[in-house]
Amino acid sequence: MDRQICPSGGRSTGDRIIIDRTTDAVKAGLRGRMLDVCLLGTGGMMPLPYRWLTSLMMRYNGKSILIDCGEGTQIAMREKGWSPNPIDIICFTHFHADHISGLPGMLLTMGNAERTEPLLLIGPRGLTKVVASLRVIAPELPFEVKCIEITENAQPFSFEGFRLEAFRVNHNVLCYGYSMVIDRAGRFDKDRAMEQEIPMKFWSRLQKGETLEENGRVFTPDMGLGAERKGLKVTYSTDTRPTESIRQNSKGSDLLILEGMYGEPDKLVKAREHKHMTMYEAAKIAKEAEVPKLWLTHYSPSMTRPEEFMEDVRKIFPATYAAKDGWTMELKFDEGE
């Protein structure tokens, strides 16, 4: 189930790397919660008076994650009435300025708000060095900034029930796409619990993901849970040529967000040269991945009206939308399952 709010105006293929430290207890407790998704900006290369640079904000269970932070990202957040201070993680797809140059200002704003909680940054190899360079103008902060560089041997990582999957894409610098996945445990099966002689007094606690012990016997959540149900998934990838990694990681997504740098068919040669995607190529990926909805983003500054290409693009994938700054969606678990 989802609810979409769309303001009319405003603002090398590689190995899959899975970042996952979600505990079974967290998975067992994820019920009835909402994932807020907001595409803060939709521009590529440079901010424009009517279009901020591409950035994605997601909020779930009281936590916030931001993907990319170009120039003006915190202004786009303010326009939505959101504060940068609650951000817990910032992920970077790559280190071109339109995706990371807004970080120093964001850090200073957080510091001025007297933030004390650590901030986690995730990005390609070299992140620590890049952040150190940017922090020359933000050296004194009242909170710790931690960096995790994605490598082929990345260690599992968890964040309040999110599972993050980073996958290599094909740009002219090292670049990754991201999927955010929220797993959902199965329903509590009373008959199964009774068959295994689980005391009824433990049922509610097992549903919350607790592991319990009584008289030397251990009771775990999976002993009373049915098959895992469909959770939620959002996939985001920009600044890349079409790759098999994007297709594979997009499967099962409730919302797919891909770059549509160019809408004109004759810009395909330019897209290939600069390692970007056309709207038509993005639509083809969405079709092959069988997702329910595609939002296009990261438009060329020369493209003032991306929506004018939708009639032709939808011939490939009907559920394609030329996203605008500030588009939001609320994703919920299907309570019918």
Name each region found by the language model:
Residues 27-80, 118, 178-180, 226-237, ...:
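Conserved beta-strand hairpin/beta-sheet module of binuclear metal-dependent hydrolase folds
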Residues 71-122, 144-154:
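Active-site metal-binding motif and surrounding structural segment of the metallo-beta-lactamase
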Residues 9-10, 14, 29-32:
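Residue-identity detector for glycine
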Residues 67-70, 87-95, 123-124, 235-240, ...:
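Active-site neighborhood of phospho(di)ester-bond hydrolases with catalytic His/Asp-centered motifs
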Residues 27-29, 153-296, 305-316, 332-337:
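Metal-dependent phosphodiesterase/nuclease catalytic metal-binding core
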Residues 102-110, 131-134, 304-312:
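Metal-dependent catalytic neighborhoods of phosphoester/phosphodiester hydrolases
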